[in-house]
């Protein structure tokens, strides 16, 4: 019978950092609220949660990398919102932010949850930040909790 590994959804005793962009703060503040709601519902101690605010999505990977290399956190949560405009700026920012965040996780071994909204319209962003489409900040925090526990289990099993 194969052995199955799966992360638990308890945040008790885990340390988190949330990197959140100030740009589009009317969206990112809602994402942050959703993430904090998920963490506290799952038993996280607010004293073990650090919130780091950066100017925009472009800066998220740099700060996330710095925090991951400190190895003080069980998981990191990245929150920002990139909304398509009339220029190609969206494509550069959204793509590079996603690549940078993925790189941090794979290079450091620290789970990094992706709560970066990339939407075509403001309405879509609002929907995904707590209106019709749930709250992607909440979802990202739950992913961070699960991955922190899964990696802890896998590292203890070897």
Curated annotation (Swiss-Prot):
Cell cycle found in the keyword field: no
Family in the record: Belongs to the DMRL synthase family.
Amino-acid positions noted as binding 5-amino-6-(D-ribitylamino)uracil in the UniProt annotation, renumbered to this chain: 23, 57-59, 81-83, 114
Function: Catalyzes the formation of 6,7-dimethyl-8-ribityllumazine by condensation of 5-amino-6-(D-ribitylamino)uracil with 3,4-dihydroxy-2-butanone 4-phosphate. This is the penultimate step in the biosynthesis of riboflavin.
Keywords noted in UniProt: Riboflavin biosynthesis, Transferase
Gene Ontology cellular component annotations, sorted alphabetically: cytosol; riboflavin synthase complex
Any one GO molecular function term: 6,7-dimethyl-8-ribityllumazine synthase activity
Assigned EC number: 2.5.1.78
Residues binding (2S)-2-hydroxy-3-oxobutyl phosphate: 86-87, 128
Gene: ribH
UniProt protein name: 6,7-dimethyl-8-ribityllumazine synthase
Keyword Transferase belongs to the record: yes
Source species, domain of life: Bacteria
Catalytic center residues: 89
Pathway entry: Cofactor biosynthesis; riboflavin biosynthesis; riboflavin from 2-hydroxy-3-oxobutyl phosphate and 5-amino-6-(D-ribitylamino)uracil: step 1/2
GO terms, biological process: riboflavin biosynthetic process
Catalytic activity, reaction form: (2S)-2-hydroxy-3-oxobutyl phosphate + 5-amino-6-(D-ribitylamino)uracil = 6,7-dimethyl-8-(1-D-ribityl)lumazine + phosphate + 2 H2O + H(+)
Organism the protein comes from: Solibacter usitatus (strain Ellin6076)
